[in-house]
A protein has these predicted regions:
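C-terminal amphipathic/interface module of NAD(P)-dependent oxidoreductases
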Residues: 150-189
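Non-catalytic, hydrophobic alpha-helical segments
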Residues: 90, 94, 109, 120, ...
Length: 189
């Protein structure tokens, strides 16, 4: 997961610094175990952003309050990065790793378009015809979710540098393209 990286600092696979806290520690521990693979096993470590599907998944959860109230809720202040990837690009990237045996090491699976949480929420609100956008203070999420709120209130600014260098082309490179291709009737269930 991209939670490996420090919050609010632009990072890519060449970044040597890791973040602080539970998520970064968990990612580090997973990767440390993966690196124990015996040689000559080819190891590709993938760090995912939020995986979004035009058919539901995490997007259904994010849309629940919007559908109920017609209000798009920005997690305050909204400036935190929101690293994401379309599930179709994620699947294509996995096939890309399998087909290109020279690839190894760490790869960030995030769209090339970096967006803030506010930008994402406003685009979602526009696509789903929200009446308004409301900024919900981070403290509300901290009270509701405790330390788990950090998944929502802090974000990592992550680039897929190595994936792009390897010649991978994203079919859904922007959040606007994601919402254009979303089957709203499926996600609205």
């Amino acid at each position: 997961a991209v939670g490996y990286y420090p919050s609010l600092v632009e990072s890519d696979e060449y970044t040597q610094t890791r973040g602080d806290g539970f998520l970064s520690d968990l990612c580090y521990a997973w990767e440390k175990e993966a690196k124990r693979c015996p040689q000559p096993t080819r190891l590709v470590i993938t760090r995912f952003g939020v995986v979004l599907s035009p058919d539901g998944g995490a997007m259904q959860q994010m849309l629940r309050p919007l559908r109920a109230t017609k209000v798009a809720a920005v997690i305050g202040p909204g400036t935190q990065p929101f690293p994401w990837i379309d599930i179709r690009d994620l699947c294509r990237a996995m096939a890309f790793f399998i087909e290109n045996e020279e690839l190894r090491g760490v790869f960030n699976l995030v769209a090339p378009q970096a967006v803030s949480q506010s930008t994402f929420t406003r685009a979602m609100g526009k696509a789903y015809h929200a009446w308004t956008t409301l900024i919900v203070p981070q403290t509300v999420f901290r009270l509701l979710y405790g330390e788990a709120a950090s998944f929502l209130t802090a974000g990592q600014s992550v680039r897929p540098t190595r994936l792009l260098e390897a010649g991978f082309h994203f079919s859904v490179p922007t959040i606007e393209k994601l919402f254009e291709e979303t089957d709203h009737s499926t996600v609205d269930r």
